[in-house]
Amino acid sequence: MTSHGDIRSTIVYNNGYVYFTTKGGYLYRVQMNADGTFGTACSYNLGGMATASPVVYKGRIYVGVCGNGEQFSSDGGHHFAVLTETASGISLAYNVSIPGYPQAAPLLSTAYENQDYNGDGQADGRVYLYFTYNAKPGGIYMLSD
């Protein structure tokens, strides 16, 4: 299998697939066959380089993306991509602009997934992601989905 750009992320596994990002700006999902060989692959163009390892949970893929500006600039167009996966591919749910390039894997917390935040008597299924970003002075960002 050939990828667009260097693979700098960790390869993560979820439900029969491996996922990784590239400096060429792509997220890949590759099927793992029962015998350990690769099966069908699909990719998604993130629009900027990605070295952070993706996090996959309940049909969502979360990954940090470098913007088109300077890598460590606070106004470089950096964002955190929230993607939706289906059997046939990957699509963008939304992007969240952030103040610096997120190069590390996020921490996903399900601690409040069963909370009812809108008062309708049903759990909202909300997860929280925490990740670092690289822009002076540095920082930690939180996203809920």
Residue ranges and their predicted role:
Residues 1-145:
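Extracytoplasmic/lumenal domain signature
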